[in-house]
């Protein structure tokens, strides 16, 4: 790469860093937390956690059918 290309990349990077540093994450995170997708993910996570807790407390479920005896 030549010097001009590197200089352009440097300036673009500095502009991006400046924009990121001036960005307020609090309002962004609040919007993300209240989004429909986040609500669906949280409800799915809660359901999976409840299922896991029930499996741990109740032990593994018994198999529905016992293995059949082998014929000789």
Swiss-Prot record:
Residues 1-22 form the signal peptide. It comes from the Eukaryota. Its main location: secreted. Expressed by the venom gland. It is found in: Secreted. GO terms for cellular component: extracellular region. GO terms for biological process: regulation of blood pressure. Residues 70-72 form a propeptide. GO terms for molecular function: peptidase inhibitor activity; toxin activity. Amphipathic peptide that shows bradykinin potentiating activity and antimicrobial activities against bacteria and fungi. Has higher antibacterial activities against Gram-negative than against Gram-positive bacteria. Also inhibits NADPH oxidase-dependent superoxide production (IC(50) is 0.4 uM on granulocytes stimulated with PMA, IC(50) is 0.51 uM on HL-60 cells undifferentiated and IC(50) is 0.53 uM on HL-60 cells treated with DMSO). The C-terminal peptide shows a higher bradykinin potentiating activity than the complete peptide. Belongs to the non-disulfide-bridged peptide (NDBP) superfamily. Long chain multifunctional peptide (group 2) family. This is Bradykinin-potentiating peptide NDBP6. It comes from Lychas mucronatus (Chinese swimming scorpion). The lineage of its organism: Eukaryota, Metazoa, Ecdysozoa, Arthropoda, Chelicerata.
């Amino acid at each position: 790469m030549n010097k001009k290309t590197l200089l352009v990349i440097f300036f673009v990077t500095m502009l991006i860093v400046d924009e990121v540093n001036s960005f307020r994450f609090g309002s962004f995170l609040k919007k993300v937390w209240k989004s429909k997708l986040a609500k669906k993910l949280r409800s799915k996570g809660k359901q999976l956690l409840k299922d896991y807790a029930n499996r741990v407390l109740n032990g593994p479920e018994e198999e529905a059918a016992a293995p059949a005896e082998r014929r000789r």
